[in-house]
């Protein structure tokens, strides 16, 4: 009997990220300072103890983070570009997204859809 199931593993890699305030060239009304940062590990954000982070700066980085967690084609802009800015034009805050480590994850640990169910349909 032939097995038509593809030989696929349920494991995948994501980069852990550190998002760092690289520069502030204007007036930051949220009192951010160069070096302020947060981490993204798997699907969880973490902030250093007692450190605040501007909501508006955070929201400008968030759409980029899932793509930066994944290895893309070397020519893809997400592989070469690592900066984003706060949307407040008076602030002129620039953040840098650094890949700091790779994390191994399993599909069933991060999804309510069973890998076995998905893999049977392929």
Language model features by range: what are they?
Residues 6-19:
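Short, basic/aromatic beta-hairpin or loop at an interaction surface
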Residues 10-13, 43, 87-88, 100:
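Helix-coil modules at protein/domain termini and other flexible surface or pore-lining loops
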Residues 19-21, 97:
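Preference for bulky hydrophobic residues occupying beta-strand positions
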Residues 36-76:
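Acidic, aromatic-enriched beta-alpha/helix-loop junctions
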Residues 15-17, 36, 93:
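Structural beta-strand/beta-sheet cores of well-ordered domains, especially the beta-sheet scaffolds
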Residues 22-27:
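Short alpha-helix capping/helix-loop boundary micro-motifs
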Residues 72-121:
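Short, compact, well-ordered microdomains
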């Amino acid at each position: 009997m032939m097995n038509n199931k593809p030989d696929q593993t349920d494991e995948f890699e994501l980069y852990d990220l550190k998002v760092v305030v690289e520069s502030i060239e204007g007036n930051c009304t949220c009192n951010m300072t160069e070096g302020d940062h947060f981490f993204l590990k798997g699907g969880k954000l973490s902030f250093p103890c007692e450190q605040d982070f501007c909501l508006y700066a955070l929201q400008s980085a968030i759409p980029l983070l899932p793509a930066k967690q994944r290895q893309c084609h070397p020519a893809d802009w997400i592989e070469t570009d690592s900066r984003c800015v706060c949307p407040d034009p008076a602030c002129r805050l620039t953040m840098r997204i650094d890949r700091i480590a790779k994390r191994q994850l399993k599909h069933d640990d991060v999804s309510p859809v069973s890998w076995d169910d998905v893999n049977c349909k392929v």
